[in-house]
Amino acid sequence: MKPICIIPARSGSKGLPDKNMLFLAGKPMIFHTIDAAIESGMFDKKDIFVSTDSELYREICLERGISVVMRKPELSTDQATSYDMLKDFLSDYEDNQEFVLLQVTSPLRKSWHIKEAMEYYSSHDVDNVVSFSEVEKHPGLFTTLSDKGYAIDMVGADKGYRRQDLQPLYYPNGAIFISNKETYLREKSFFTSRTYAYQMAKEFSLDVDTRDDFIHVIGHLFFDYAIREKENKVFYKEGYSRLFNREASKIILGDSKTISISLENYHNYSQGGVTLATMLENLPNFLTANVTEAFVSIGVNDLITGYSVEEIFSNFQKLYSLLAENKIKMRFTTIAYTLFRETVNNADIEKINQWLTEFCYQNQIPLLDINRFLSKDGNLNYHLTSDGLHFTQEANDLLQSQYQLFVDEVKTL
């Protein structure tokens, strides 16, 4: 018997109206849950059910090719519980029917979370599987307040307090609930002594209940650079098309740091935010037979996006092979250090730069170490950056002059 998936989507939210359908990262929030269920590969599409009281929700959700069940009026009020809804929904199924409840308000839950949780349920003797996350703030630091505003439960709480000595605590994050009809209706709960806690990391466990929660999730998705790279592929492809110059014989391949660089007889193909990986995908489209030289200064965005150091090594090798096959002369720069950036660390940049230095030496490629004049004590110089990653005008001017000197020096070799 195949499992079924149930996605509740009542329309009457008072705290955040229509929260289940609010557009999030280009699609209604409910689609993040529907798509995760589909992509998990654990259900037939017809066995993914949205339970709603809204004809508009129904019409939109059907666009995903799944099933929609309209709730009875008495199950559409804010007094109706999840148990009431599930008891009614499961009434026509066999007692051993396995089901998964996915709440729309956990839009960051991934397809592989669903798959892993279901595989555990199927292979172990448990009543239920429910997703849990670790509590950030220990309840030992919580208190009630007296009428006068005193923290009466906290007296002496900081004496010898060491967070690392506290036992980790976990809470159900609302993302995944798995059971079967007989067990759930008997217990009237997903929580028994035999409920297995499927642990999910904090970054996937945000629950949307208020406007502040929704804004938090928007911010999380905005700073998911892997998603942004995927969504921006068309943007970069169009960008390279706009920059295309069939007659160019010398080209600059870079990101935002090289956009302002102007070298005589060089055509600049730099784009802000682009990764080496994305540039590689597009390179065959603008690498004409006229190109004889390439100046490459790229790589930090790959680290920010989440590519491993080894993947970046591999992509540099692919770039070298492609340019070498076309008998194109190359010159590279190291990757500039950053300063106080959460998304990238200089230890990884140093690993890549050391690898680039050895690689360029072995293949007789001229290499310019831009950190010689941009860094201080192993970091990007504070006076040369606007945000720890991007350059000030002073840095851009310095880069321009050093690039020009480098090109001129290589000419004389």
Curated annotation (Swiss-Prot):
| UniProt-annotated location(s) | Cytoplasm
Name a GO molecular-function annotation: N-acylneuraminate cytidylyltransferase activity
- Highest taxon of source: Bacteria
Please list the coiled coil stretches. none
Q: List the GO terms this entry assigns under cellular component, sorted alphabetically.
A: cytoplasm
Q: Do you know which CDD domains this protein is assigned to?
A: CMP-NeuAc_Synthase (cd02513)
Matching entries from InterPro entries are given as: CMP-NeuNAc_synthase, Cytidylyl_trans, Nucleotide-diphossugar_trans, SGNH_hydro, SGNH_hydro_sf
Q: Which UniProt keywords apply?
A: Capsule biogenesis/degradation, Cytoplasm, Exopolysaccharide synthesis, Magnesium, Manganese, Nucleotidyltransferase, Transferase
Q: Which stretches are transmembrane?
A: none
What is the role of the protein in this entry?
Answer: Catalyzes the formation of CMP-N-acetylneuraminic acid (CMP-NeuNAc), which is essential for the formation of the capsule.
Instruction: List the protein's name.
Output: N-acylneuraminate cytidylyltransferase
Q: What's the encoding gene here?
A: neuA
